[in-house]
Amino acid sequence: MNRYNLAKKYQEPEENIMMDIGALAKSQEELIDLSIGDPDLITDERIIEQAAQDAKAGHTRYTASDGSAAFIQTVIDHYKSRYDLDFAAKQVRATVGAMHGMYLTLLAITDPGDEIIIHEPYFSPYKDQIELAGGIPVVIPTYEKDGFQLEADILEQAISKKTKAVVINSPNNPTGAVFSEETFQKIADIAIQHDLF
């Protein structure tokens, strides 16, 4: 099979510098890896024990693809008790991870040519996910001197008639920065004003 049988978007992939960085990192001694948020800590013994008990009790098979009824109810209860928000079971879905959930969300909301705003530094898959969903990534900066907080005026300047959503990454990967309550409120106000996801 030759490469031209692949979808055109995969025939000439962009260079992925992460592979080169990974190879270089492996050649270094005593390097602290901050790339994927995978700590070198052993999982808490209580979690290990509970997982083992669940496996021994027969919880080793596939569950419902959108999440078990017990899980969905736990999510509903959490959002009610913590944030006083009400959700119906049909509004809650489980995914295999945050990247999977993000990609499914982008597929659900993005039409070809829609612009999706992401703030940099950003988790490297975000740009690709937006493009694979048919969207156009619009990258805006955040700055170390501001604690990597998203500035409302910079966000406003990036919005166009094609803007569909703003990706919020807090705590941020890779910086670890957490948006302040004030920053979140400004983003929410702008999103409501412009009818953005």
Whereabouts are the PLM-identified features?
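Conserved PLP-anchoring active-site segment centered on the Schiff-base-forming lysine
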Residues: 108-130
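A short helix-loop-beta submotif of the ANL/AMP-binding
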Residues: 132-138
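Aromatic/hydrophobic pocket-lining residues that form π-stacking "cages" and hydrophobic walls in ligand
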Residues: 21, 126, 187
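Helix C-cap/helix->beta junction micro-motif
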Residues: 28, 133, 193-194
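Active-site phosphate-binding strand-loop segment of PLP-dependent enzymes
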Residues: 138, 143-197
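Short acidic capping loops at alpha-helix termini that bridge into adjacent secondary structure
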Residues: 86-92, 112-115, 162
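N-terminal small-domain helix-loop-helix segment of the aminotransferase-like
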Residues: 8-97, 104
